[in-house]
Regions:
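Compact, Lys/Arg-rich rRNA/RNP-binding cores from ribosome-related proteins
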Residues: 50, 69-81
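Short Fe-S-cluster ligation motifs
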Residues: 56-57, 79-104
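BZIP DNA-binding basic region
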Residues: 33-39, 43-44, 49, 98-130
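Charged, low-complexity alpha-helical linker segments
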Residues: 23-26, 127-133
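Conserved aromatic-histidine-acidic binding/catalytic patches
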Residues: 9, 13-16, 41, 45, ...
Length: 133
């Protein structure tokens, strides 16, 4: 049976979970910062504590859940999990190009540089033209 923590117990539980996790983030696999710089993640539906996470990863988790619920219209957690797995597979598949097409508004690094240089030249020309009076 789950036990509701008192606020004064949060730091001790956060540290205990940090040690249980061997100082590793269960989401990213990265090394966790010291327990005092982590947060005690919990499910906002049930209140159950899940793990000790870095603050940034905890924020990412919440934002992704919110996006999937609101924009992705996920009605239950299993649907959200299915979509996330599908998204990861999709990204992995497309690390190698699957088509020969480039989106019309995409700029290559050379095109970005040319655009920036043209903007700088235009600004210099405008400044020169405006200061000769």
């Amino acid at each position: 049976m789950a036990v509701k923590l008192k606020q004064k117990e949060v730091a001790a539980v956060r540290e205990a979970l940090w040690k249980q996790q061997k100082g590793a983030c269960p989401i990213s696999g990265r090394r966790l910062p010291p327990p005092s710089q982590c947060v005690l993640d919990h499910c906002h539906d049930t209140g159950l504590v899940r793990a000790t996470l870095p603050r940034a990863i905890n924020g990412v988790e919440g934002k992704i859940k919110n996006i999937l619920t609101r924009w992705g219209q996920c009605s239950d957690p299993f649907e959200a999990i299915r979509i996330l797995r599908g998204l990861a597979d999709y990204w992995e598949t497309h690390l190698k190009p699957q088509t020969e097409y480039i989106y019309p508004t995409h700029l290559t690094p050379a095109e970005k540089l040319a655009k920036r240089n043209a903007k700088v030249r235009a600004a210099r020309a405008a400044k020169k033209g405006g200061s000769s009076g």
